[in-house]
């Protein structure tokens, strides 16, 4: 089970939003590269970056901070990034800079042809971010709810060749209410590619619950507010996940 610390970037700083609201941002660090180093030193095996300004602007807006993070830890672990990725040129720029994966969200839903082209051009590097509320997909920084069912879109995108899916339950994100395990497992069982859970992770119990369903295709979980607020000790959580995985592997 991959525990993936999130570094959300707004105006070059590391912040956390409450339910995607740019006006409800808490600044946790003015040095995102140092934050990345901290998580890697604590045992992170992948990092999840979000260009929040980019998500709303539709183009890269935190390039300097992203490059600083990649310079700091990019040679050590894979780094993935979402937010504002709307063109093949942007993807190419990011992958050339050292990102391992880019996450396409809104653009995948609104312009499936773009996603298809991206999967063809950058095979193995494209992750789809599906944000949903009550099983329906949301777009545009969660501000618009579509009529699309998550599972239907996930199956379609799997056919295009996406590497994995980051699934966010937006009713729970930043609220420390616990991961929506049932919805995550349902999605993972419906597709043959890995699913990464996101939104609502609050404590060690969530990690233990996710480890129990890893065999269904839940590859990891994005750790956001809980590791910044102190509700979850990241190093202890990764250690516990590794212990559980060892127990499950030996069972």
Curated annotation (Swiss-Prot):
> What GO CC annotations are associated with the protein?
cytoplasm
Q: Which UniProt keywords apply?
A: Amino-acid biosynthesis, Cytoplasm, Histidine biosynthesis, Isomerase
Family membership? Belongs to the HisA/HisF family.
Pathway assignment: Amino-acid biosynthesis; L-histidine biosynthesis; L-histidine from 5-phospho-alpha-D-ribose 1-diphosphate: step 4/9
- The protein in question is named 1-(5-phosphoribosyl)-5-[(5-phosphoribosylamino)methylideneamino] imidazole-4-carboxamide isomerase
**Which HAMAP family does the record associate with it?**
HisA (MF_01014)
Which molecular function GO terms apply here? 1-(5-phosphoribosyl)-5-[(5-phosphoribosylamino)methylideneamino]imidazole-4-carboxamide isomerase activity
Q: Where in the cell is it found?
A: Cytoplasm
What residues sit in the active site?
Answer: 8, 131
Top enzyme category: isomerase
Q: Which organism is it from?
A: Burkholderia orbicola (strain MC0-3)
Q: What is its main location?
A: cytoplasm
Underlying gene = hisA
Q: Which reactions is this enzyme annotated as catalysing?
A: 1-(5-phospho-beta-D-ribosyl)-5-[(5-phospho-beta-D-ribosylamino)methylideneamino]imidazole-4-carboxamide = 5-[(5-phospho-1-deoxy-D-ribulos-1-ylimino)methylamino]-1-(5-phospho-beta-D-ribosyl)imidazole-4-carboxamide
Listed InterPro entries: Aldolase_TIM, His_biosynth, HisA_bact_arch, Isoase_HisA-like, Isoase_HisA-like_bact, RibuloseP-bd_barrel
